[in-house]
Amino acid sequence: MKQLKRYFLSTVGLLMMSSTAHSQSKLDGYIAEGLTNNSVLQQKQIDVEKAMIALRIAKSNYLPTVNFSGTFSTAKGGRYSDLPVGDLLNPVYATLNQLTSSSSFPQIENQQIDFLPKNYYDAYVRTAVPLVNTDIIYNKRIEEQKTVLTQLDLTLYARQLVNDIKVAYFNYQSSVQAVGIYKKALATLEKNIALNEALIANGKGLNIHLMRAKSEWETTNAQLIQAENQQRNAQTYFNFLLNKDLSSPIENELVVADASTISTDVSNREEINLLEQSKSIQQTVLRMNELFWVPRLNAFLDLGSQGVEWEVSSKSAYYMVGVSLSIPIFNGTRNTQKVKLSEWNLKQADLAIQQTTQQLSLSVQLALNALSTATANYESSLKQLAVAEEYFHLIE
């Protein structure tokens, strides 16, 4: 988790550093707040942590596994084997008894040995370790690449979130400016109405001018109501991105972007890096599928005890060492088809990278053109505003 936090903080720092070349203290503060509190971004962080856990699981496949196993069985009947020990030894025992004038050698019966044991147990601890297994090697590499993939996905969403916060902030700024403009327009129209009423009272005005002024006031007032509603909507959406109370106030700060500071290089964009990492995963999968012919070799060691009637002694204890080898010979061409499928996936990844690069280059160029146009219109509007203010003061 500490590693994840360090990665996330570095991501936030890079995004904050690249957010603008000008001082935007208030906007930067909102961006940092959004990157910290956004619930979707927190889910992405959990995805990174899960990918790291999956990587640790893949690495653990190199380690030995230790398991305890035990069986108990009892049986009666079934296959058996006759052992004529009585027929073989009783004549000898009888002769020995005659020679020794004693009964030291009793007569014994023939024995029947059952193949199915009665009250038999076998308990052991098995330690197994893989010696040769290419699947384990490449699965670990794939999980490493998936971890990087989830980190890139986190960075990509963080960048998109920064963009959404900026757009929402600028929309809120625009709505605030629009409300201010309509309020000033209403104040000017109210002065115009009062002026026309005074002219009419002195017999120097026309009712049509007064009616037109009142009509313009009603139209502007309706536009003001609409602008105030847009301002509330912009405020609500901006606070939603920051995971705050939807009615929280927003500090307003005029920020003007500079098109000259925007980079047109898309080669290091998160979208491209994400697709490049996906391609690397496909390459690893292809290599793993191509090595389907490599044998799997495992070794094991058993330490245990076996016997009947739960007898445990030095004689019942045992150990067993062994190796297992698996060599693929034929499985219906499934492995060959997997290789072909991986090759097509790799070609598809290359095409996706090319298409995304072109789309990003196009979107950047269109955005720069739109920004240049908006900047020119803004500068022209400032000049028109200065002329209009001077004209208004002259006629006032």
Walk through the language-model features, giving the residues of each:
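Membrane-embedded beta-strand positions in outer-membrane beta-barrel channels/transporters
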Residues: Y124-R126, Y169, N298, G322-S324, ...
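Amphipathic alpha-helical coiled-coil segments
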Residues: Q43-A58, Y157, N163-G180, A198, ...
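Small/polar (Gly/Ser/Thr/Ala-rich) solvent-exposed segments
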Residues: Q42, T65-Y80, Q112-K118, A128-L156, ...
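Primarily recognizes Gram-negative and organellar outer-membrane beta-barrels
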Residues: N37, N67-F115, K204, T264-Q277, ...
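Transmembrane beta-barrel architecture of outer-membrane proteins
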Residues: Y120-D122, V167, R212, E276, ...
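Terminal intrinsically disordered/low-complexity segments used for targeting and assembly
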Residues: M1-E33, S69, G78-N110, E228-I262
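Periplasmic alpha-helical coiled-coil/stalk elements that build and connect Gram-negative outer-membrane
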Residues: Q3, G29, I53-L55, L152-N268, ...
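Bacterial Sec-pathway N-terminal export signals of envelope proteins
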Residues: H22-R79, K204, L242-Q283, T357, ...
